[in-house]
């Protein structure tokens, strides 16, 4: 039977690991969202340029 200190250590390590995983996952989600935003902005800019050039002709 583990002692109270051992249980506390196990709980602390489990909590720390879960917080670390949540932080990594949050960073991943944030970077994916930023990537999609930049892709969308680039596509809109390109569409605007194409519209300008087709309007000139």
Curated annotation (Swiss-Prot):
Stretches in topological domain Cytoplasmic: 38-57
Subcellular location(s) of the protein: Mitochondrion outer membrane
GO terms of biological process kind: mitochondrial cytochrome c oxidase assembly
Segments passing through the bilayer: 15-37
Cellular-component GO terms for this entry: mitochondrial outer membrane; mitochondrion
Domain of life according to the entry: Eukaryota
Main location per the UniProt record: mitochondrion
Keywords annotated in UniProt: Membrane, Mitochondrion, Mitochondrion outer membrane, Transmembrane, Transmembrane helix
Mitochondrial intermembrane side: 1-14
Bilayer topology term: Single-pass membrane protein
InterPro entries: COX14
Protein function: Core component of the MITRAC (mitochondrial translation regulation assembly intermediate of cytochrome c oxidase complex) complex, that regulates cytochrome c oxidase assembly. Requires for coordination of the early steps of cytochrome c oxidase assembly with the synthesis of MT-CO1.
PANTHER family with a match to the protein in the record: CYTOCHROME C OXIDASE ASSEMBLY PROTEIN COX14
Oligomeric form and interacting partners: Along with COA3, core component of the MITRAC (mitochondrial translation regulation assembly intermediate of cytochrome c oxidase complex) complex.
Name this protein carries in UniProt: Cytochrome c oxidase assembly protein COX14
Taxonomic source organism: Rattus norvegicus
């Amino acid at each position: 039977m583990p002692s109270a200190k051992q249980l506390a250590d196990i709980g602390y390590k489990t909590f720390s690991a879960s917080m670390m995983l949540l932080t990594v996952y949050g960073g991943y989600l944030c970077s994916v969202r930023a990537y999609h935003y930049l892709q969308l902005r680039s596509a809109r800019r390109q569409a605007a340029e194409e519209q300008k050039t087709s309007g000139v002709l």
